[in-house]
Amino acid sequence: QCRASVRRMNPAFSVIFFTTLSGAGFGLWIWLGLRIAFGAAPRDFQALGWILLLVFAGIAAAVGLLASFWHLGKPLRAWRAFSQWRTSWLSREGVLALACFVPAFALLLLLAAGDGSDAMARAVAGLLALLGLATVACTAMIYASLAPIPAGRHRATVPGYLLFALLTGGLPMLLAAGFDAAG
């Protein structure tokens, strides 16, 4: 195959920044959601660590999402993207990304009130994990569905995005677990 016919991806810095930060934030929310939904009740100051991780993930996701506006042609019209959620992966990603902040904030309030082990906290945490997974999958589908970029139209795109989010979100989770075990 002729080299001239191969199209390479040359994403803008804002796309890389968005993908990295938001992926890490949503990945951390996925891990936290799974840990709280299916793990043992928090002990000692563990709930405080979870609160800090929830906030850290929220900041990473929010900054990443704001970075996504940098590569829009007309950022002031970004709100219109939400109206196309039935047909657009970009719109679905936006709706789900914003929806993730609702259970994250609710979980933060439950943990702050000392209710980190009750059924409500576990249900909200499970919802956060599911919404986080769905958001990352929608992000991947944006690139997997772009016909002009053949590199994105590969069966490994969605699993790759999910794996990247879980790995980058898992790093702060592992660090926190290390501090918890040492303390």
Model-identified regions with their sequence ranges:
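Alpha-helical transmembrane segments of polytopic integral membrane proteins
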Residues: 27, 31, 66, 72-75, ...
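N-terminal signal-anchor module of multipass membrane proteins
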Residues: 3-58, 62
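Long, contiguous internal "core" modules enriched in hydrophobic/ aromatic residues
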Residues: 6, 13, 18-23, 40, ...
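Membrane helical hairpin/interfacial module
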Residues: 34, 45-103
